Structure formats: C-alpha cells, structure tokens
Amino acid sequence: MTIRTEVPLVVLPVTVTDSRGRTIDGLTEADFVVLDNGKPRQAQVDSSDALTSPVALAAVLQTSDISAAVLAKLRKIGGMIQEGLSGDRGEAAVIGFSSEPKVLQDFTRDANKIDDAFRELRGSGNASGCMLDALELALNLLSDRPRNPRREILLISESRDRGSKAKLQDVVEHAQRLNVTIYSLSYSVYTTAFTSKPSDTPQSTEGTGLLGLITEPARLARTNTVEALTAATGGRRLSFTRQAGLEEDVLKVSKEIHSRYLVSFTPPQEAIGSFHTLEIQIKNRPDAIVRTRPGYWTVNSN
C-alpha cells in the first residue's frame, strides 16, 4: 500500500518594482516564471489585496534606555500600525525588548489598544537589546495565528543584536518555516541630531548570496543582523533619523505589504522536510526587480 501525504501550498508574497523602485502593477500569471531548485512550477498569482488573506503583524520595538530619543518618536506612530499595516481585516501585536522581550499588546484588531501600547512605551533602564530573542517571541506568537493570514514582522531597532540567547540562523529558519516576512526600520543610537540625511534610503540586499546566508552559520555571524533577516525572508531594510523619516518608512512598508503579488504552487512530494531555493522571473520585463524569499521549507500538513 502506498501512503500519500498532503504537502501544503507554498505561498510567496512577491514585490515587483522597476529600476526606480516603482511598483509594477497589472501582472498576471502568464508574466511569472517560478523556478523551484531550477525547475519551473505552475503557479497561481493573486494581486487583489481585498481577496487575499488578512495580515497578522507583530511590531517588535527596542525599548532600551539608549533608544530614548527614538521612543519619543515611536509613541506617535501607533495609529499607523492598524490603519496602514495590518489593515481593516488584519490584527497586530506589540513586543518591546531590552535585556529581555515582553509582550506589550497581544494580537488584536482594536486600533486603540495598539495605539495605547505605543503611547505607553518607556525605556527599560539598561542598554541591552536582545533583538533575536524578541523576534523568536514574535514568531511564537505568529505561529499561533490561523495558518492563512499573511504573517509579517515590523522590527524597529538598532541594526545589531545585544546579548540574545537565540541564534541568528535558528531565527532565520524559524521565520522561513512560518512564511514570515521581516521588515526592518533601523537607526543609530549614537545619532543625536535626528535630522534627515542622504543615507536615509533603503539598504539593498540584492546580490548578498542569500543561500549562503541561510546555510553557513559562520557567514551569518559576520553579516549585519537585520540585513540577514530581511534578505532571508523577502523583506526590506529601511533606516531613519527623524520623525518624518520614520513615518515615511512606515508608509512605504504599508504600501508594499498591500501591493505585493501572492504567488502559490504545490511543491513536489519529495520536497517534504527539505529546503528548496526559489527564483521568480518576470517575462518581457528586463527592468523588473523581484523581491521574495530565497527559498522555502516544506512540512507534512498532517
């Protein structure tokens, strides 16, 4: 007797822009080429935000005393989280971290509760920043959400980790297995004059050798933490120095989350338990820049 197992769909949020960073809309299934370990797969493409699953977003915020100048800015953006990022049908949670992570607000659709969690942000009294531990907590919360929502993390912090017990490679793999996309808004705690600078632009992770980031622990250790996290999950890293820059970056992430294509396909049976590399190409658009996860882990859905 042959026992067959059900392999869950691979679902990929995909951002497609031109060389100037403008979203390319109006693409159809016929425009996409999906390569799974180099082999083409027949995929379904959905571009309607109203028809796709709701967003479950965890906002992960560094609350160390060394981030005091940034906390004053974060207190003003709580209203943007539910309204712009998770959306009317979605839900959001808030996690703060310094020497240890703490759930400040569990998942809710109540925009006022999210806003209150941001307004009540306070410094923790130390200079620690256990970013990876906080992300692991966020991933555990997201793992309890219904399987269908789009799962996102918005990390607002320094670009480095300060004293986590969790390992970068483990957090990366956990996020990939849960199909979570990580977006990062990073800052320098040593910048005291929070004024706009030419460097307040997206930091590209193109060409960083994503498979190497996933499979080589030594290389992961030498990589900027937030760059590794965003690149390995198909997210984006932005940086800010002033209030206007922070709010602009939140809007950029919001727009991207709600304008992505959702590409899905059924992986082969033999893929269960393995990591497969992915490449997505756009036909007849040499100017198209595609950003998504560099691969996927498959599990038995039973």
Describe these PLM feature segments:
Residues 1-302:
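Scaffold/interface architecture of coatomer-like assemblies
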